[in-house]
Swiss-Prot record:
The gene is Atxn7. Acts as a component of the SAGA (aka STAGA) transcription coactivator-HAT complex. Mediates the interaction of SAGA complex with the CRX and is involved in CRX-dependent gene activation. Probably involved in tethering the deubiquitination module within the SAGA complex. Necessary for microtubule cytoskeleton stabilization. Involved in neurodegeneration. Component of the SAGA transcription coactivator-HAT complex, at least composed of SUPT3H, GCN5L2, TAF5L, TAF6L, SUPT7L, TADA3L, TAD1L, TAF10, TAF12, TRRAP, TAF9 and ATXN7. The STAGA core complex is associated with a subcomplex required for histone deubiquitination composed of ATXN7L3, ENY2 and USP22. Interacts with SORBS1, PSMC1 and CRX. Interacts with TRRAP, GCN5L2 and TAF10. Interacts with alpha tubulin. Proteolytically cleaved by caspase-7 (CASP7). This is Ataxin-7. Its main location: nucleus. Widely expressed in adult tissues, with the highest expression in heart, brain, liver and kidney. Belongs to the ataxin-7 family. It comes from Mus musculus. One of its GO terms (biological process) is positive regulation of DNA-templated transcription.
Length: 867
């Protein structure tokens, strides 16, 4: 032991024969615990490696095989096969067999140890460049990393005495299992203590010498002089001592304290988080020398310790052999294994058994698909939590310190500025995201990974277009099972070129480059056409809200034969508006001598006027309103617009019960009794795509058919009004309905009513019938309740608070005082009280104009029901 250690400290090259003899001599001596320093084959020795600084380990290793010569330059064999270069690079005078034999007889005593590929999770991808330290197991002389030591012992020597190693409280990080299932490499390997021959480990805040009574060894362990090695009986349990830090050249051995026990280096803490194999952890090793001198400057110690303990518990469970797990049908595959006759205890995402086999397993508390979805969601959540937690200790383990992020100009997605001369956007020198991260693909905007998740890769090229991101769908399924992930840095993305020629093109989309700007207009026009087409398809079902403030005559295709007169009706609408746009609920037929007959419905003006304040032109409009609004107290609980006599402000609309009178076809002949506005409608109800129109039927046959609609079909299209109906009050009598009584158009329209119906002396009950025609002929989706004004000479509705369930579907006779004034012989209307549909107004209880209410009402409730 002393010969090997002395040789290593002095750095003298050892020849193969002498090494073999020394190895045989060492086999007879008890093997003490020694830290193994991995010597890369082609690395030059450094002064801080200890000794005199003239150690030529790589030269010694190659000298045992043959004289070393420089490899031939690949440029000398330009265009030829790589095999020629391999042959030319072989050592002179030796063929492959001799090389193999010499290496075999050189055995375990060579200075540079060959590692097999299975050990890559332990030793990393590039042992030539990675600095790490090894420990030797006293039982089997296996060389393992400190992180892998505990799992190695549990796997190999758990039958023998368990390690009586208590983690000292002064050291922060306990020894954690490496998650590699692979074996360690060959047992040999050179071991040398650090300069001064002392073993060091860093503790939480300062380097502490452990008290002698706390040394966790069962054998009588004598603390030796610091310069000497601590001797341990061979039969004792492994006591790995770990050389933690690369020694700074100026540091003396006297600064180092010694400790025994499985105190892992604090710098390796983050490496063992969910295990060495977590892909986002680059390597479990030491940072640059200046970062942790004297063991200080280690941030976030307690949290790291907690995380490492949790991860060790989790990984112990995962590393359990499948046969040792207790079967749970809710979390395990459960398919009976033919060999062991036991249920499979892999997770629900078991790749060994098919989906049908896993679905056929009995005893699960839920269906297999539900459990599988929950399992995948949990795995994703764990992954997210793990990546969040790894953002904290990013100063540790960062072998290539990244340059500070350059201030980046604000980047817009390429879709928002498609035709600007956009070169490939410079991406900040950020690092690729670890493979566990969800792929963030934001069009062609480059992504910066979170600043904490720094990985050991060199920065990405600055001119890399971010449109080449790769997505990682489907990786979350077997993350939990992939225990054998490599402990080496690798990128989750395809390698990117540092720069590439764009050949004068401009990138205007994801992977979309344009060479000629002459086609920009055509491309833009095509894009707009495609967008318009898609939007038109979308808005066929959801009509857009018009934001105009004047009645749009071009968007009101009238459905009667009296187009000129109805255009006159629109001009009267424009005359009556003061502040709010009237909304055409249906086409209105107006006779040439200002006799208004609401043939298909009514035109509601959203602006209530003061009593007697309207001129005869406005009275035409107000007559039309009064056709539907003068009966205030029908049993359907119509609510009115409360307005003072002189107020011109838009009033507060409240939803209430809508009227749905069931009229006979005799009542619906009001549509046709005007002399100049006989409607020649088709009698069919067709869907109207104009958002301003509520489709109405134009003949008495369709109105009677729609009046035969069941209340249930109405219910389907309505939203029940949750509030209490708004009480119609007496001050609301000064609304437009009053004007229609005082103006001449009322009597004129009464004349037409007598001509069409026969009973004389029809008073304001006539507008009820007109109103019922309108409601019946519309598709039972429009609630006119909030927009119906009440006349002054009519009493307050006595039925406004009748409960909804009593009135739905019940036919009630109107009281003479409530529905007919001056015409008690008129035919009583059968009214079924129905819920109002404009539930949208429950949100707009403020002072909003009636036009908005009407617009919302007509928009949200386009008719779709068929008789």
């Amino acid at each position: 032991m002393s010969e090997r250690a002395a040789d290593d400290v002095r750095g003298e090259p050892r020849r193969a024969a002498g090494g073999a003899a020394a190895a045989r001599q060492q086999q007879q001596q008890p093997q003490p615990l020694q830290p193994q320093r991995q010597h890369p084959p082609l690395r030059r020795p450094r002064a801080e490696d200890g000794g005199t600084g003239d150690t030529t380990t790589s030269a010694a290793a190659m000298a045992t095989v043959g004289e070393r010569r420089p490899l031939p330059s690949p440029e000398a064999m330009l265009g030829q096969s790589w095999n020629l270069w391999v042959e030319a690079s072989k050592l002179p005078g030796k063929d492959g067999t001799e090389l193999d034999e010499s290496f075999k007889e050189f055995g375990k005593n060579r200075e540079v140890m060959g590692l097999c590929r299975e050990d890559m999770p332990i030793f990393g991808l590039c042992p030539a460049h990675d600095d790490f330290y090894l420990v030797v197991c006293n039982d089997c002389n296996q060389v393992v990393k400190p992180q892998a030591f505990q799992s190695h012992y549990e796997r190999r020597h758990s039958s023998s005495s368990k390690p009586a190693l208590a983690v000292p409280h002064t050291s922060v990080f306990s020894l954690l299992p490496s998650l590699s299932k692979s074996k360690g490499s060959g047992a040999g390997g050179s071991s040398r203590p650090p300069s001064g021959g002392v073993l060091c480990a860093s503790s939480s805040s300062k380097l502490l010498r452990l008290p002698k009574e706390k040394l966790p060894l069962r054998g009588n362990m004598k603390p030796m002089h610091p310069v000497q090695q601590i001797k341990v009986p061979h039969g004792r349990v492994m006591t790995p001592s770990v050389k933690v830090e690369k020694m700074h050249p100026k540091m003396d051995g006297t600064l180092l304290k010694s400790t025994v026990g499985p105190a892992c280096p604090a710098t390796m803490s983050s490496a063992v988080k969910p295990g060495l194999n977590c892909p986002s952890i680059p390597k479990p090793t030491l940072p640059s020398p200046g970062q942790i001198l004297n063991g200080k400057g280690l941030p976030a110690m307690p949290t790291l310790e907690k995380k490492s303990e949790d991860s060790s518990n989790n990984r112990k469970f995962l590393n359990k052999r499948l046969s040792e797990r207790e079967f749970d049908p809710d979390i395990h595959c459960g398919v009976i294994d033919l060999d062991t006759k036991k249920p499979c205890t892999r997770s629900l995402t078991c790749k060994t058994h098919s989906l049908t086999q896993r679905r056929a397993v009995q005893g699960r508390r839920k269906r297999f698909d539900v459990l599988l979805a929950e399992h995948k969601n949990k795995a994703r959540e764990k992954e997210l939590i793990r990546h969040d937690s790894q953002q904290v200790p990013h100063p540790l383990r960062d072998p290539h310190p990244t340059p500070p992020r350059t201030p980046q100009e604000p980047q817009l997605p390429a879709e928002s500025k498609p035709f600007l001369a956009s070169k490939p956007k410079p991406q900040t020198p950020s690092l690729p995201r670890p493979p566990g991260c969800p792929a963030q693909q934001g069009g062609s905007t480059p992504i910066d990974p979170p600043p904490g998740q720094e990985s050991p890769h060199p920065p990405l090229p600055a001119t890399e277009p971010a449109s080449r991101l790769s997505s990682e769908e489907g990786e979350g399924d077997d993350r939990e099972e992939s225990v054998e992930k490599l402990d080496c840095h690798y990128s989750g993305r395809h390698p990117q070129p540092a720069s590439f020629c764009t050949f004068g093109s401009r990138q205007i989309g994801r992977g979309y480059y344009v060479f000629d700007s002459r086609w920009n207009r055509l491309r833009c026009a095509l894009n707009l056409m495609v967008e318009k087409h898609l939007n038109a398809q979308l808005w066929k079902k959801i009509p857009p809200v018009p934001c105009t403030t004047s009645p749009v005559s071009a968007r009101v295709p009238h459905r009667t034969n009296s187009v000129p007169t109805s255009q006159g009706g629109i001009s009267y609408l424009a005359a009556t508006t003061v502040s709010a746009p009237p909304v055409l609920l249906s086409s209105t037929c107006i006779s040439p001598n200002s006799k208004s007959v609401p043939a298909h419905g009514t035109t509601l003006n959203a602006q209530p006027a003061g009593s007697g304040a309207m001129d005869p032109v406005c009275s035409v409009q107000s007559r039309q309103v009064s056709a539907s609004s003068s009966p205030p107290s029908t049993p359907s609980g119509l609510s009115s617009v409360p307005s003072s006599p002189l107020s011109r402000k838009p009033q507060k609309w409240k939803p209430s019960k809508s009227i749905r009178p069931k009229e006979s076809s005799a009542l619906s002949t009001n549509c046709h009794n005007a002399s100049s506005s006989t409607s020649g409608g088709s009698g069919k109800k067709r869907k109207n795509s104009s958002p301003l129109l509520v489709p109405s039927s134009s003949s008495s046959s369709s109105s009677s058919s729609s009046s035969s609609h069941s209340v249930n079909s109405f219910r389907k299209n309505c939203v029940a009004h949750s509030g209490t109906p708004y009480l119609s009050t007496a001050p609301s009598s000064h609304s437009i309905g009053l004007n229609c009584v005082t103006n001449k158009t009322h009597s004129v329209s009464l004349r037409h009513e007598q001509a069409g119906r026969g009973p004389a002396g029809v008073s304001s009950a006539e507008p009820i019938k007109r109103m019922s025609v309108m409601v019946n002929s519309s598709d039972s989706t429009l609630s006119l309740g909030p927009f119906i004004h009440q006349a002054s000479e009519l009493p307050v509705n006595p039925h406004s608070h009748t409960p909804l369930d009593k009135l739905i579907g019940k036919k009630r006779k109107c009281s003479p005082g409530s529905s007919t004034v001056g015409n008690s012989g008129s035919k009583p209307t059968k009214v079924a009280k129905l819920p109002a549909m404009n539930n949208v107004h429950m949100k707009h209880t403020g002072n909003i104009s009636g036009a908005q209410g009407l617009t919302n009402n007509s928009l949200l409730h386009q008719p779709k029901a068929r008789p």
